[in-house]
Each structure stands twice: as C-alpha cells, then as structure tokens.
Amino acid sequence: MIPRVIEAKYIKDYILFIRFSDGSEGEVDFEQEIEGEIFEPLRDIPYFKNFNVNQELHTVVWPNGADFAPEFLYEKLQVLA
C-alpha cells in the first residue's frame, strides 16, 4: 500500500513533521533534498513554510508545484523516540 500523507507541520529550518495514514509519524529533514530547478525556491525558508497537503496526491506540495513522492517521504521519516 502506498503511504499517504495526512498531516504536515513546519518544525524548523528545512524540517517538517509528517503523519501518514498508517499512523507512522516523525520528522523529515529536506535540507539535502532541495536540488534542481523546481526545488530551488524552497531554499527560501518563508517559501519552504508555504506548503500544503494535497488530498489528491497524498503528499506535501508547494505553490510552484514542487512535491516529493509520499513513498520517498516515508523512507526519509525519522521516527521520534
């Protein structure tokens, strides 16, 4: 089953708290993942904070259309102890 992002909150820097539909939750640090033309605007922290959870794509999306596959986010998830 493909994981679905159901909630995301800004934590700090390039870190988001993400909750998945299967109950998994934790933090994802995007700092090393922001590469390429579509992701370049995300280097600006105020812009990075301006995301939403797209209910059709089931992932985090920014205004310019940049997104990360939910499977990728699931793999990068750092579960909080």
Language model features by range: what are they?
Residues 1-81:
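Motif-centric detector for short Cys/His coordination patterns
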